[in-house]
């Protein structure tokens, strides 16, 4: 993936410790948010005040909505799939009185829609991946002018088998992320 980060200036943000055990991120500032956008937002705001990072790296699991996706991916487009105020004339995913439906970061990558439900059937908003936290994290980083980087490991296909697949693939994703991103990062900063 060739993306490198400095452990001293980077904050790792992960929903659950079983997605990336603390021992695998030794030497890094890491916080666990808990599940969902509100938990993610509260934890990230507190962590930014405490650590004052130059960049935030979000790692976690995600369900794939596009056939054939597997492994570890960079995500650069973020949507909020459960914001639904269409009855008042706003587009699905649009927060009322805000212009942006999508948050984009630098570079090429996949899209991820976040919402406060574990997806086991395709949602109405089209995206490559689904998760439960990334949109909130990306939005906070944009508002605070902090570089945001997101890596997602495909744990399931966001279908009827998603719950069982998710738990089986967490360790594989953590090992891959640690090997490709964390273990090599002290050599060059992003």
PLM features: residue spans?
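Extreme N-terminal starter segment of soluble prokaryotic enzymes
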Residues: 3-11
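Glycine-rich phosphate- or other oxyanion-binding loops that anchor nucleotides, phosphorylated ligands
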Residues: 17-189
